[in-house]
Regions:
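ABC-type ATPase nucleotide-binding domains, specifically the catalytic core motifs of the NBD
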Residues: 29, 47, 85, 110-128, ...
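Conserved ABC transporter NBD signature motif
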Residues: 73-81, 93, 126-130, 232
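Conserved ABC ATPase signature
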Residues: 147-151, 155
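ABC ATPase signature
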Residues: 108, 151, 164-165
Length: 250
């Protein structure tokens, strides 16, 4: 892993990290997809993971959220190693995965979809969290009784993120949130992600939209063939044309 020097300090120390991943290995069957991944996220950070299709981004998300079991390595969240915990236990700790493709329940209403994100919470907490989501996404309030399957792609993405917020996350993993959206909607969505972060939620943004991600993120990692090959401040990575050309196809 090559680290691009930062002008304003280095990577978070493990003791300061909200998420600290060390030598993570994961895969499917006999295929090892992640081949020794190290990653840190400090409280309040937006960290981007960039890379082309097929390099292991989705596997990383699934391993961090417990959907794919780690074969080796540590995933420490607030100091607790969650590498072998079940997804429900990881959610209860406040690590929430918003998957690629939105995955809303099309025949349920917007409100019912949101409430599924807070199934572990009491009624009072559910109401409070729903109001918080509606303040961030006013369109969801307007469509609260509408079936999720009738929403536009952008509205479904807002619903998927809102459902994640219902679980009171400390860290949200967002897997390709801009996929399939128009440039105008992408700008709107990234502004809303920035607002969520300003409210105290750390963000792991896994994206192919390199330009928008580097503008939003504090730091970035570049994933290639199951390993991080570069990390540093988003500003420094964005200013390196050779790096972007070699690993990001820009």
């Amino acid at each position: 892993l090559v680290t691009v020097p930062r002008q304003n300090g280095g990577l978070p120390m493990p003791s300061e990290a909200l998420l600290d991943v060390r030598d993570l290995r994961a895969g499917y069957g006999e295929t090892e997809v992640l081949r020794g991944v190290d990653l840190t996220i400090a409280p309040g950070e937006i960290v981007a993971v960039l890379g082309s299709n097929g390099v292991g981004k989705s596997t990383l998300n699934r391993a961090l959220s417990g959907i794919v079991r780690a074969r080796a390595g540590a995933i420490k969240f607030e100091g607790h190693d969650v590498a072998h915990e079940k997804p429900q236990a990881i959610v209860a700790r406040g690590l929430i995965h918003v998957p690629e493709g939105r995955r809303v329940f099309p025949n349920l209403s917007v409100r019912e979809n949101l409430d599924l994100g807070s199934y572990r919470r009491g009624a009072a907490s559910r109401t409070q969290n729903r109001e918080r989501v509606f303040k961030i996404f006013p369109r969801l309030r307007e469509r609260s009784t509408q079936r999720a399957g009738t929403l536009s792609g952008g509205e479904q993405q807002m619903l998927a993120i809102g459902r994640g917020l219902m679980a009171e996350p400390k860290l949200m993993i967002m897997d390709e949130p801009s996929l399939g959206l128009s440039p105008i909607l992408v700008e709107e969505l990234f502004a809303l992600i920035e607002r969520i972060n300003a409210d105290g939620v750390s963000i792991l943004l896994v994206e192919q939209n390199v330009v928008q991600s580097l503008e939003l993120a504090d730091r970035a990692y570049i994933l290639a063939e199951g390993k991080f090959v570069m990390s540093g401040s988003a500003k420094d990575i964005g200013a390196n044309p050779e790096l972007k050309r070699a690993y990001l196809g820009m």
